[in-house]
């Protein structure tokens, strides 16, 4: 895509062929699906797969993470939500937790420790093999999303755990990610399609996607260092497009 004051926006492919706006919309149907649908030009199928505006919207996502996001000082307390509320909508969290050689829950309404819940979560986590202290963790405790998957936590032995609160009780699963990988950074995703659980990077700056069934897939890209690089992922029901950059550009 080229833009100039004199000629406006022009669109070309790798061979130099120029396309009109309407043609370009059809080349990227999952990106311009609303425009195509409004003009009755959205196909019924793409690559043999049925598509509707709802299906496309459900599969589209954008993920962005900068080095600043990773390098920021981490809070001592992390809010935790109820992943299975009584009502259909997620509720604002009323509790937070801190981790030391155990996990401790604090009721944010009166700043008191919930000893019963703290003991229960701590017991279950340790029964599942969790070794404190926590090396790193990632969660997104906001009700402005469709669902909640709690936290991905990396324990002291580089094992990756999935921890969330369901009906006030602990949900703790070891994901099976090999400790030998030395996972150093995790980012929970919670995309609308509910296919993935998070993105992980190891000690060698390899990038992985962790699916909801805890299967792990290494992405075939160059090294990605979360401490110095920026990462942008745009995905749809067919493909992921990744862009890795730094202070000097892409």
Name each region found by the language model.
Residues 95-97, 150-152, 161, 197-199:
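Conserved beta-propeller blade signature
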Residues 49, 54, 94-98, 102-108:
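Soluble catalytic regions of membrane-associated enzymes that act on cell-envelope
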Residues 9-13, 100-116, 157-164, 204-211, ...:
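Structural motif
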Residues 1-2:
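Alpha-helical transmembrane signal-anchor/signal-peptide segments
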Residues 114-127, 171-179, 211, 217-225:
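Beta-propeller fold detector
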Residues 154, 201, 237-250:
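Extended, hydrophilic extramembrane loops/domains of integral membrane proteins
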Residues 8, 15-67, 71-93, 128-148, ...:
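Repeated scaffold domains used in trafficking and secretory/extracellular systems
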Residues 98-100, 154-156, 191, 200-203:
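Conserved beta-strand positions in repeat-built beta-propeller and related beta-rich domains
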């Amino acid at each position: 895509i080229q833009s100039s004051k004199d000629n406006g926006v022009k669109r070309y492919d790798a061979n130099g062929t120029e396309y009109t706006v309407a043609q370009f919309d059809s080349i990227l149907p999952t990106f311009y699906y609303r425009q195509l649908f409004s003009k009755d030009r959205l196909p019924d199928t793409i690559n043999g797969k049925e598509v509707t505006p709802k299906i496309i919207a459900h599969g589209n996502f954008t993920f962005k993470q900068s080095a600043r996001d990773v390098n920021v000082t981490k809070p001592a307390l992390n809010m935790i939500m109820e992943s299975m509320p009584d009502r259909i909508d997620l509720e604002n969290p009323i509790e937070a937790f801190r981790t030391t050689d155990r996990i401790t829950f604090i009721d944010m309404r009166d700043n008191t420790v919930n000893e019963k819940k703290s003991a229960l979560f701590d017991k279950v986590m340790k029964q599942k093999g969790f070794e404190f202290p926590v090396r790193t963790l990632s969660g997104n405790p906001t009700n402005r999303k469709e669902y909640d998957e709690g936290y991905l936590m990396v324990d002291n032995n580089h094992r990756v755990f999935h921890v969330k609160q369901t009906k006030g009780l602990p949900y703790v699963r070891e994901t099976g990610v090999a400790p030998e990988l030395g996972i150093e950074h995790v980012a929970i995703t919670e995309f609308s399609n509910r296919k993935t659980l998070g993105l992980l990077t190891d000690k060698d700056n390899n990038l992985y996607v962790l699916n909801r069934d805890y299967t792990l897939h290494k992405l075939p890209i160059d090294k990605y260092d979360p401490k110095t690089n920026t990462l942008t992922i745009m995905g749809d029901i067919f493909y992921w497009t990744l862009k890795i950059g730094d202070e000097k550009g892409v």
